[in-house]
């Protein structure tokens, strides 16, 4: 089994392991093709990545460059991420399978109140390989 892992995610606030989207695109270009599993901190754009912005509006906040590399070049069997914690009134946790690409996306980082006061409240995903 070939696995690629990364802690990086697009810049949002003052957190560790963040890079500008331009720098991240160059970084994602280095993901080797033929990986079975890609496990990264943040999701691809449009894949379990809905979140409330500062204006309390929903937006897709995943990385579009990462999505391009995953769907068109790397093509892993499984793509695992977290980082997007909102799941109040949103389906953001769990698994999403894209049959046209034969890729399963996973987000197991849900919290119920957007403030982490209840902690991680989603029990994760189990994937048989």
Q: Which positions does each model-derived feature cover?
A:
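Conserved catalytic scaffold of divalent metal-dependent phosphoesterases
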Residues: 1-65, 110
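Hydrophobic/aromatic beta-strand patches that form the interior of the parallel beta-sheet core
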Residues: 4, 78-80, 104-106
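Generic alpha-helix signal with a bias toward terminal, lower-confidence helices
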Residues: 15, 52, 83, 117-118
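Proline-aspartate-enriched helix->loop->beta-strand connector
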Residues: 35, 40, 63-86
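Binuclear metal-dependent phosphoesterase catalytic core
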Residues: 68-73, 85-129
């Amino acid at each position: 089994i070939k696995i690629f892992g990364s802690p990086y995610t697009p810049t949002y606030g003052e957190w560790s392991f963040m890079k500008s989207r331009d720098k991240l695109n160059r970084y994602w270009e280095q993901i080797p093709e033929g990986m079975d599993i890609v496990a990264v901190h943040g999701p691809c754009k449009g894949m379990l990545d809905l979140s409330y912005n500062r204006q309390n509006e929903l937006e897709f906040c995943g990385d579009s460059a990462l999505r391009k590399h995953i769907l068109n070049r790397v093509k892993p069997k499984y793509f695992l991420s977290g980082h997007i914690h909102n799941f109040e009134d949103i389906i953001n946790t769990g698994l999403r399978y894209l049959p046209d690409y034969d890729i399963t996306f996973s987000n197991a980082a849900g919290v119920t109140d957007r403030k982490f006061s209840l902690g991680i409240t989603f029990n994760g995903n189990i994937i048989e390989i």
